[in-house]
Amino acid sequence: MRTSPRRPLILKRRKLSLPHQDATPCPGASEQGKAAMMKTANLPEQTLAHELEDMAPKSKADQETPGQNEGGDTLGQSLAPTMRLPSNPPQSCPEDIPGFPSGVRIMGHPTMADAQLVIIPSQSNVQSIIQALTARGKEQGGPNKYIIISSESAIQTQAWHQGPQIKEEECVNSQSEATCISKQKPTGNSRKAKHRQEEQLNASLSNIQWLGNMSSESLGQYSIKEEQEDKENQIPECAKMEEEPQSFPDPQWPLSVTERPPYSYMALIQFAINSTPRKRMTLKDIYTWIEDHFPYFKHVAKPGWKNSIRHNLSLHDMFVRESEANNKVSYWTIHPQANRCLTLDQVFKTASPMSPADNEPQKKMIPDIRKSFQSAACASNKERKMKPLLPRVNSYLIPVHFPVAQPVLLPALEPYAFGAESSDGQQSSKRVKIAPKATADDGESPKHLGLCSVKEEPDISNLKCEDLFQCKRVSSSRRKQQLLPPHSEEPELVLPESIASDSGLDTDFSFIQDASANPNQNLTSHPTQNCPSNVTQEGLLHLTHDGPSYLTQVSSSHFTQDDPCQFTKDDTFYFTQDNPIQLTQDEDYTFKTPIKEHFSKPTTSSTPSKPTDTGLLQPWESETSLPRDPVLDFSPVRIPQGSTFTPFKDNLGTLSFGDTPFKDFGIFGSPQNLLNALSPASSPLLRLESPCVSRQQKRCSKELQVGASANRSLLEGLVLDTVDDSLSKILLDISFSGMEEGNGLEVDGVWSQFLPEFK
């Protein structure tokens, strides 16, 4: 903090510890010396200068006598051992330095090593002496602090230190009387100067010393109430005369000052308002009533409790504000329908008459509901009981009874019944649940594959149409949820599941076939319903054989309950009737870029359908697919060539980058395209080289886990799987130009065969 320019520099007060000599000086002389030294150490330069100008002049003849020099030497010698002066002998100012008048003496300060005492005559020019001292300090490099005192004060100090010597000369009484008489005048002047200085300090704006003398003891008992909050509560004299007498506190009420009463502000307001006959009260009267009946709010509580009272008055609808005709005075009342007429006397009453000895400690007891309830059980005759209000905390809490079985807001997924061994292969809800492996020679019924990430589908061996539509697929992608059509607008068709690879690029009905070694074992499916190849959608499985492996694309035509495709623990497919072909996975799979040469047998839907014409060129609508050039037909991403119309991330079909996805997909139109069955018997089985087999032989475990994460229902026709982000961006531009709404002649016949199965 910057000091005021008018405020003089005040040195810090230091108490001088001066050892006493053997001889005791006179009391007047000692007091005179102490006053002089305190004045020397404390008063600033300019204050001393003004004081010295008012002092009586000293004759120059007395100052220029050689005895004066000797007296100065004697003063320095006497102060040196007594006041522990530093090695700064008293110096007489040289005459050749301009600005110093005659008679000026300089000596070292008794306690401050970097300061010197300057004794000047009373009539000398203080300003010229200060300038001369400043020039001398710059030239000689000595102490830069000078304390200017008058010669009269020095004589008093000299007399104080020479007191023992005067006593030895038997002149103690006369010298002390003269010294005491001479001290009266400078002492009075110093007191006046000090008083003037204190007045200047008190007048300063930066002075905060008065804060140390502040205390709250002088404040009155009602000083807290002296707040300007009567803006709307100024009661005129006539209204005060008509005001009913208010109820006074019960003398038996225990006045507790230390703790807060166990009542809410809402209850306190009701106590106050209901205490008057007219059941109305001004805001100021409410404050006064609460303070009179509960001293805690008067002496202990912070003033913010009044804000809480105003807040509760405005918050609750039961408190109504009424105004007089002149709108000068407003009262607070309680709504008649909400008024319970709750008063303090009703809440607190004596349980039994008590002796005065028992009554005295009860006055100090805090009226707490919890303490009263606990004490009422054990000592109901000795303690007062609180008539319970509604509980303070729970009075505004409405109990809500929740049912034991909470309502199901979303359709829950029915869990699949797995065997005891299938718990090892269970993954998360987004993973395919794969049954553990078992030997192919087991006579047990084969375990089947189930899904939790798609629609609930029963075991493939026991597929029923009424079980296909029980549950929706829970998708993890928001894009899937946005693309899903409403339930009432989509025909739900479910495709069978498989544990085949989910590499992100291939999901065709493809199998490994040994065409050269065992041409009779070429995996074919018959167009009739008696012998379908009910192999599930992802069919890149390894066929056990002795010769080289080839990749063949074979699609399933009809999925019936008579000839199910059974899937065992060791990932083996059994065709239970005409073609008992065993498919195993004995080797590991690899993840490599797929190599495709030609279309093989296109895929078909798992729903019952009829074979269509074979003269059409589109692989989606024809029974046979035309072979194409492997170079021109290559694409980095393939889509299925059957009824799985969605560009799966792991499909190996062709795709078109020309249009938007699903533009030509008449999902809400004729379902004939969905029910066109392709007969794979007439399509040639084309071979691929064995590198494709090595790609399928080593497959990572992640692909097996995500193997059937794609939907096997028609919902996936409108859903893009976004597990592979880079692939999903490519699939956004895929269009199915081969799907058109032609050939709608068989729709009625197909649906007439399909829909009765749900009954």
Curated annotation (Swiss-Prot):
Output the CDD domains linked to this UniProt entry.
Answer: FH_FOXM
Show the ranges annotated as biased composition (Basic and acidic residues): 48-63
- Region entry Disordered: which residue ranges? 1-92, 420-450, 516-535, 596-631
* Tissue expression: Localized to the animal hemisphere of early cleavage stage embryos. During neurulation, expressed in the neural folds. Later, expressed in the spinal cord and in the eye field. During tailbud stages, expression is still restricted to the neuroectoderm, predominantly to the hindbrain, the eye and the spinal cord. With ongoing development, expression is also found at lower levels in the branchial arches. At stage 35, expressed in the rhombencephalon and in the eye retina.
**Gene Ontology biological-process entries:** DNA repair; G2/M transition of mitotic cell cycle; regulation of cell population proliferation; regulation of transcription by RNA polymerase II
**DNA-binding positions:** 260-358
- Superkingdom of the source species: Eukaryota
Q: Which GO terms describe its cellular component?
A: nucleus
**MF terms per GO, please?**
DNA-binding transcription factor activity; RNA polymerase II transcription regulatory region sequence-specific DNA binding
Function, as annotated, reads: Transcription factor regulating the expression of cell cycle genes essential for DNA replication and mitosis. Plays a role in the control of cell proliferation. Also plays a role in DNA break repair, participating in the DNA damage checkpoint response. Promotes transcription of PHB2.
Record protein name field:
Forkhead box protein M1
Task: Tell me the organism.
Answer: Xenopus laevis
